[in-house]
Amino acid sequence: MTINIKAFERQFQKEYNFLYENDNNVAGYREAVAAFDEFLKENKNFVCEFVQYRGDFISSDREAAAFMFALSNWEV
């Protein structure tokens, strides 16, 4: 998987802000959270790279959903 980490982080932040502004009441939110758990199992290296770049763990459901919504902008 080749994704520009800087561009991904910008998209992640946009998705996170959207979720925050809408109090997580967004179609596909629960599915995205569940999908993150599965994605993590197969793509630990990418998630770790993102966490290191960002300097913060993905520790909330909102962050997990934002990650998956951001990822949906790239073909993987």
Residue ranges and their predicted role:
Residues 20-76:
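Acidic, low-complexity, intrinsically disordered interaction modules
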